[in-house]
């Protein structure tokens, strides 16, 4: 994949002519180009936005999460910067915000908010459910400790969004391996069920690993998995799922398999019917 670059710098260095720039590349932000066949990612947008800022902005929010290794980030979202330009082009969101030196790291020469500061920004600037899914993915990728994020919550006590940030951070679980796993866990918790443990291994009587549940209430031997399209289209995974379901049923587990076709109310009924008590 072609990396974003500053058009005038490419011409000045002799890397390409003005004609080649116009004919072979496309501007994604003013003055910032990529080769025409480039499939933009969230990481590429983040770098392009940083270049647009004359390399002065601090990459933040979703863009920081992308550079820090988070999965499941759609390329179509605007890049996010902490930067003093209040009139960014389409595709970039800027905000003027205070950021301490210990809240910034450097990745490939770019200033990026640390995992803890990124988690705080996501928690205070997005709706709770969306923030939880984003921070789940960030925590899964970076192993950021919520205690470190809480220190920043205390640092910025009284700032806008801190109250909702506390709500989101209390619901985060780094064990979620997809946004829909986050959704399923939040659905269960909000329905009044105890918070499940995530990524729970289950072994047979010989100690052989049968599989790993997305989440489980081990005291009542109830587990839930969210099964996306890959569970159906990947034949090897499909076969593993069948084997796991048959084996754990024989071990007296209740295994709840959830797909995009399931209604929320029905999922809640299935969890309750399986014997998970409400708190």
Regions found by a protein language model. Give the residues of each.
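Short gly/ser-rich loop at a beta-strand->alpha-helix junction or flexible surface loop bordering the NTP-binding
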Residues: 1-163, 179, 277-279
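Surface segments flanking catalytic/ligand-binding clefts of nucleic-acid enzymes
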Residues: 7-11, 15-17, 55, 96, ...
């Amino acid at each position: 994949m072609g990396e974003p670059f500053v058009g005038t710098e490419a011409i000045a260095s002799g890397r390409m002519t003005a004609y080649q720039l116009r004919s072979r590349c496309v501007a994604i932000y003013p003055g910032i180009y990529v080769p025409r066949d480039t499939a933009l990612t969230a990481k590429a947008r983040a770098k392009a936005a940083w270049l647009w800022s004359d390399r002065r902005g601090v990459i933040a929010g979703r863009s920081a999460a992308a550079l820090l290794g988070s999965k499941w980030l759609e390329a179509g979202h605007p890049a996010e910067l902490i930067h003093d330009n209040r009139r960014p082009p389409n595709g970039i969101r800027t905000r003027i915000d205070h950021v301490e030196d210990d809240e910034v790291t450097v990745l490939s020469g770019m200033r990026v908010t640390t995992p803890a500061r990124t988690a705080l920004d996501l928690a205070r600037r997005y709706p709770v459910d969306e923030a939880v899914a984003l921070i789940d993915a960030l925590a899964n990728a970076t192993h950021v400790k919520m205690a470190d994020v809480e220190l920043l919550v205390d640092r910025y006590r009284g700032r806008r969004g801190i109250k909702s940030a506390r709500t989101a951070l209390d619901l985060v679980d780094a064990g979620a391996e997809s946004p829909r796993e986050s959704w399923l866990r939040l659905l269960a918790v909000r329905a009044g069920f105890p918070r499940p443990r995530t990524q729970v291994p289950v072994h047979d009587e010989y100690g052989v690993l049968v599989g790993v549940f997305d989440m489980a209430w081990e005291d009542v031997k109830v587990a839930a998995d969210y099964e996306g399209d890959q569970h159906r289209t990947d034949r090897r995974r499909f076969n593993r799922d069948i084997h796991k379901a048959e084996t754990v049923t024989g071990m007296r587990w209740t295994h709840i398999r959830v797909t995009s076709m399931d209604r929320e109310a029905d999922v809640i009924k299935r969890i309750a019917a399986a014997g998970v008590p409400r708190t």
